Amino acid sequence: MLVLTSAVLALTPVTANAAEAAPSQVTETVIAAPSPTPKKPQKKGWVKTKSGIRRYYRKGKRLTGFQKIGKNYFYFSAKGTLLKNTTVNKGYRGFTYYIDNKSHVIGRKKGSTYYTANGKRMTQVQIANLRSKQIAAEITNSSMSKSQKLQTCFNWVIKGYYNIWRDFDQGGKDWPATFANDHFLHHNGDCVSDAGAFAYLAKAIGYKNVYVCADAVQSNNNAHAWCEINGYVYDPLFAEAKSYSKYYGATYGSYGLYPVLKYKIS
C-alpha cells in the first residue's frame, strides 16, 4: 500500500499554478551607448606651428590685422601669420604700418602724417628714429660688421645731391631730426640734412655717442654741420665734394672745424 501511494504521487501532473511559480530563465542583452568624441581643447594665446609660424588665438579664433596684445601692437596677415620686419601698405583702416624685427608695430602713417602704434601723432624725433630704422634695415644686412654698416649708411647719404629745403634757423629745437627728415623724405639736402640723416642712421645700427655739430649758432644760416661719433668727425657733404678719406672718421685736428652747437642723438 505504501508503494502504490508513492507511484501515484510521482505521476501526478504539475498544475498551472505551480508552473507560474517557477523562476524565469530569460537573459537580457544590454548594448552600451557609444562614448562621445572628446572635444579638442580650444586654442588660446601664442601658438607656434612646426614650420615656425607664430599666431595668436583669442576665444578659439586666430587674430588677423592690427592687434594690441598686452602692452605691444602687432600685425597679422589675413591667414593669421605674425608679420616681422616689414611694411604693410594700405592696411587696417588705410594706414601704412611699420613693423620691426621683433614683430612690434613701431609706427603707422596715413597721408603724410606719422603716428605712434597707439595712435598719437609723432614728433620730428620719433619720425627720424622710425625712418632711420627702416632705411638701415633696407640697405644693410646681418652679415655686415658694425663698421661696414656705418660706411654703407654714409655712402647712402652722400648719393643724394645737394639741395636746401629750409634755412638753419627754421629747424626748431630738434633741428637735427627736422633736417634729417628732409633728407629721408627726398634723399637729398644740405650739410645739416646730410649730417642729421647720417647721425640717425648711425644710431639705428647701434652707435651710442652720436652728435650733430655745427660751427655757428642756429641763427646763423651760413653755419656748417657734420656728425660726430665717438669723438671722430663724419662729414657727408665734404666727403662728397672734397675728399672721402679726409672727412670719413677724421680727427678734429685734421678736420679744422670745431663745434659751437652740439646736439646728442637719443
Residue ranges and their predicted role:
Residues L2, V8-I127, D169, C213-N230:
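Extracellular adhesion/carbohydrate-binding repeat motifs centered on closely spaced tryptophans
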Residues K43-T49, G65, T178-A180, V192-A197:
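A generic short-segment signal for beta-strand/edge and adjacent turn/coil regions
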Residues Q126-H183:
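Secondary-structure boundary elements
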Residues K149-C153, H187-A202:
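Active-site nucleophilic cysteine motif
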Residues G196-P259, S266:
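Hydrophobic/aromatic-rich core segments of domains that either
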